């Protein structure tokens, strides 16, 4: 092969890699958005269930494994961290309190929000 053909192939490969990188970035943004939306829907669902279940019937119910049948409520601190993340701050232990770059989601923060 001559040098021009090799250069053309390398240039073509570089362009395809750039396109794949852009596509991967878009998928990462979509995934982060879906994880975050799933978290908020989960919290909202728990709050709605809490309103619907009768207070007297579920407080003392225990499953065979010894756990309370009532789901653990998301605490006020967790909601505050979710609000801080929405406002553009890191809540992960790696970058806690620093400002996230505009439009960039942190997978560490999102995994922390989605913990059970």
UniProtKB/Swiss-Prot annotation:
Positions of region (Disordered): 52-73
Pfam families xref list: YabA
Regions of compositional bias (Polar residues) in chain numbering: 58-67
InterPro entries found in the cross-reference section: YabA
Sections of the chain in a coiled coil: none
Locations listed in the record: Cytoplasm, Nucleoid
Family: Belongs to the YabA family.
Quaternary structure and interacting proteins, as annotated: Homotetramer. Interacts with both DnaA and DnaN, acting as a bridge between these two proteins.
Cross-referenced HAMAP family: YabA (MF_01159)
Protein name: Replication initiation control protein YabA
Organism: Shouchella clausii (strain KSM-K16) (Alkalihalobacillus clausii)
Lineage: Bacteria, Bacillati, Bacillota, Bacilli, Bacillales
């Amino acid at each position: 092969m001559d040098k021009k053909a090799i250069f053309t192939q390398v240039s073509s490969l570089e362009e395809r890699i750039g396109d794949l990188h852009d596509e991967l970035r878009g998928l990462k943004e979509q995934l982060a958005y879906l994880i975050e939306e799933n978290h908020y829907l989960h919290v909202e669902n728990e709050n709605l269930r809490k309103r619907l279940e009768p207070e007297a019937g579920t407080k003392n119910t225990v499953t065979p494994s010894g756990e309370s049948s009532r789901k653990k409520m998301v605490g006020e601190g967790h909601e505050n961290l979710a609000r801080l993340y929405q406002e553009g701050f890191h809540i992960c232990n790696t970058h806690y309190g620093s400002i996230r770059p505009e439009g960039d989601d942190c997978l560490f923060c999102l995994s922390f929000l989605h913990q059970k």
